[in-house]
Amino acid sequence: MRLLRRRHMAVRLVMVGSAFVLFLFILQRDVSGREQATEKPWLRSLVSQKDHVLDLMLGAVHNLRDSMPKFQIRAPEPQQTLASTNQSCLPGFYTPAELKPFWERPPQDPNGPGADGKAFQKKEWTPQETQEKEEGYKKHCFNAFASDRISLQRALGPDTRPPECVDQKFRRCPPLPATSVIIVFHNEAWSTLLRTVYSVLHTTPAILLKEIILVDDASTDEYLKEPLERYVKQLQVVQVVRQQERKGLITARLLGASVAQAEVLTFLDAHCECFHGWLEPLLARIAEDETVVVSPNIVTIDLNTFEFSKPVQRGRVQSRGNFDWSLTFGWEVLPAREKQRRKDETYPIKSPTFAGGLFSISKSYFEHIGTYDNQMEIWGGENVEMSFRVWQCGGQLEIIPCSVVGHVFRTKSPHTFPKGINVIARNQVRLAEVWMDGYKEIFYRRNLQAAQMAREKSFGDISERLQLRERLNCHNFSWFLDNVYPEMFVPDLKPTFFGALKNLGVDHCLDVGENNNGGKPLILYTCHGLGGNQYFEYTTQRDLRHNIAKQLCLHASAGTLGLRSCHFTGKNSQVPKDEEWEFTQDQLIRNSGSGTCLTSKDKKPVMATCNPSDPHQHWLFI
């Protein structure tokens, strides 16, 4: 009897062994089958059926195993804990010692020019100093005289961020990824460029800084050639790579990214200063989700005094990026839904667009979503294009308020465009054609140069970008407006009339004048056919809009012509009578509220009693 049991035991062992070998063979075939199934959808159902068979077989093996006598041949294995599933990093949080900066800042002179981020001040100027200051403004469009006298390694004073930012801790698992900092420059002032570099070295944890890559976009200033190369050798992790031909920001950043070795790319402009703890919150968010593109809270370094606008602990009004229908980037306060979502300043801000100058992104994700459009030239539009692409293709744009970086905002660019400023319109046409679907017509009505390029197909080949959109299975632009930026007012896709409003009595066009965001009087000006200040739309809601950037409406309150923010903003709103206009068959424009008509008097637009026989009340969209 005992012998029979032993024979049965041997048979069972053979059966278990055979079943296990067969199981391993099928499992190996299953792996290759799954790889094919991801590429061939018709195989997915077969793989699913195979999964069911494997489950049954595995169950049979387990049943045979469990029916066998149990032999205690080793000590019980300890229960695996959650922490042991990831042996590559330690539990808990990074300590301040672990996050020590790459370089400690040298002792500071509290009375030095611009110390602790304070403004540079000077009361008396010699003729030579005045000349130097003026030349600095002319060359760099900021006060290079002041910058040159402020320490390259100046401190920015105590950490004034909100307490929850100062006290924020960062988990070791998943570990914070290291970053390559990429800084593009073209004829940048020596002091602002090097202060940016030192700022990174003095505020970035050594374990997180892989390298700083300075990308020279064909600078012509001699001090940025061999002297710069010689200087940065002492900075250990800093290298210079160069474009021999001026190609602009986009290709320069692509060059920097191509040589970067870290997991994360961090792009900065060449006139920045980083505040306490600026990098860790950016990297922590990417460690959580590599499809998030993160920007710091960008504060102002005054272009005249180089005063650093420090963060405040309470009461800051946060902003996010937006765009208008001329595809210009801008800022706006957070909508109520975003304010309610955030519990404190450690919460990211969801942003429809980003400024594009300062941000961090996973290198692998940067490559996955198509880096930059390398057929865009110099700069202009690349940030809006990337904003649309990230959101529409499954990623997110966020601003991290606890990360603070200062930036010198200039009122104009000191650099020329080798191919003229037409490159901006060309870049914008490329992004409109790839990402905006039918909504691109709203943009083309506001930019006649871009519309002409689109008609003439003079914006280059976009086939690769269209293939990228298809390959990534990206959402359409309607989805972006509905889900990412529902606050965006969408003008009529096909307004009743649009263009310039020409007065037939004086042969001039209605014009809003310079920098008129409402409240300033309108004017009549020679018709120039360029849109801009002379662009108007008569909508299906019967309001008359100047909406290149903001949605501004003509109104005739108390018989006076004016311009103000439109009352009709979509759902749950309507056009008030003083913003409602009627275009008559006699070419009059009558206001529904006052009953008066738009007329020209002394070459100024005013409201007057309607008179169909007066040519100064005859208007035509051209």
UniProtKB/Swiss-Prot annotation:
Domain Ricin B-type lectin residues, every copy: 507-622
Catalytic activity: L-seryl-[protein] + UDP-N-acetyl-alpha-D-galactosamine = a 3-O-[N-acetyl-alpha-D-galactosaminyl]-L-seryl-[protein] + UDP + H(+); L-threonyl-[protein] + UDP-N-acetyl-alpha-D-galactosamine = a 3-O-[N-acetyl-alpha-D-galactosaminyl]-L-threonyl-[protein] + UDP + H(+)
Residues given in the record as UDP-N-acetyl-alpha-D-galactosamine binding sites: 511, 514, 528, 533
InterPro entries per record: GalNAc-T, Glyco_trans_2-like, Nucleotide-diphossugar_trans, Ricin_B-like_lectins, Ricin_B_lectin
Binding site for Mn(2+): 269, 271, 407
Any Gene Ontology CC annotation: Golgi membrane
GO biological process: protein O-linked glycosylation; protein O-linked glycosylation via threonine
Annotated spans, Catalytic subdomain A: 176-285
Superkingdom in the source lineage: Eukaryota
Record GO terms (molecular function): carbohydrate binding; metal ion binding; polypeptide N-acetylgalactosaminyltransferase activity
Cofactor(s) of this protein: Mn(2+)
Associated pathway: Protein modification; protein glycosylation
Primary location recorded for the protein, binned into one broad class: Golgi
Residue intervals on the Cytoplasmic side: 1-8
Region annotation (Disordered) ranges: 103-135
The entry's keywords: Disulfide bond, Glycoprotein, Glycosyltransferase, Golgi apparatus, Lectin, Manganese, Membrane, Metal-binding, Signal-anchor, Transferase, Transmembrane, Transmembrane helix
Membrane association type: Single-pass type II membrane protein
Keyword Metal-binding recorded: yes
CDD domains (UniProt xref): pp-GalNAc-T (cd02510)
PANTHER family: N-ACETYLGALACTOSAMINYLTRANSFERASE, POLYPEPTIDE N-ACETYLGALACTOSAMINYLTRANSFERASE 6
UniProt family annotation: Belongs to the glycosyltransferase 2 family. GalNAc-T subfamily.
Protein name: Polypeptide N-acetylgalactosaminyltransferase 6
Lineage, broadest ranks: Eukaryota, Metazoa, Chordata, Craniata, Vertebrata
